[in-house]
Amino acid sequence: MPLSTYPSVGKLLWLIENEPKVAAAHDKGTLAFGTVDAWLVYKLNGGPKKNVFVSDPSNSSRTMFMNIRTLQYDEALLDFFRIDRSKIHLPKIVKSSDPTAFGTLASTKLKGFKITGCLGDQSAALVGQKGFTPGMAKNTYGTGCFLLYNVGEKPVISTHGLLSTVAFDFAGQKPMYALEGSIAVAGSSIQFLRNNFKFIEESPQISALAQEVEDNGGVTFVTAFSGLFAPYWIDDARGTIFGITAYTQRGHIARATLEATCFQTKAILDAMEKDSGAKLSELAVDGGMCNSDLTMQTQSDLIGINVNRPEMRETTAFGAAIAAGLAVGVWETLDELRTVNTAGQTVFKPTITKEESATRMSRWTKAVEMCRGWSN
């Protein structure tokens, strides 16, 4: 994982150095730090009364000081980041699915109910899409965009700008690993057109606006509002629109905005194929942007494989439910889940040639290179 604002460690160090209350707690040895799941589980258990302070590997791997092979905190990484464990309490790392590790709810009508599953949101979406076996991948199109590719029981260390992470770690099984590619701006680019350019009143209207024109009219929009994440990792890139002419209409910019996420997804998938040595056969999708048929068809065209959209798209919540259910015997094996949520699936198939896809991608790559350095 490259040093960036993405992992937790930089935020922890900044807080210690810049926030007096955090610094004071650190000096006293009373500071506790973990990812948001650890805080939620701690609070749901009643806070200091029970003091259940735990996290699972899919979340802890994002701190940047967990060893993804041992699934425990790495002393060398802790030393590198100057993290003194005598002054900072870190959550215990436990299985993603466990009948006792996460405690019980301390209040509300569900008081006494066990918490039996915990996953990072993208790992939960992969599980919810039933990406249990190597070679399966999902892409969540939300405010940002997150693509996870299951690589199996051994981590694949990326050399092409991706994150090597823990997908999930269920009891009775070996942990499963994934390659992840993150796009900083996806659905938020539609919000930008709505709020800043006033192109639309509601975000779902973006597809209709984009379909007012046949293509992007030569417009390319690199939506690098805060730099570019995987596989580029260009911190000083900024949002840039190329190819505007007197002919350009709002629909062209709307279409180019939707295409930006699709181009970045293709770049990530290309990197995943290089890292894993295997070509993906299909892509499962979820998240708000996947409701746009135009966007999903564009995605299929660019990556040259089928894009599968389930009818029930709350796959992140479903994945969390699977983790919890496995711990208490709702399902005995993952095989029991393979046919769940398959009815009503929409499949988008490529409609352009590989050559046309490559031509479009070449233009996008050129635009990415030209948007470097604008924050300096």
Regions found by a protein language model. Name each.
Residues 58-174, 184-188, 201-216, 282, ...:
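ATP-dependent carbohydrate kinase catalytic cores
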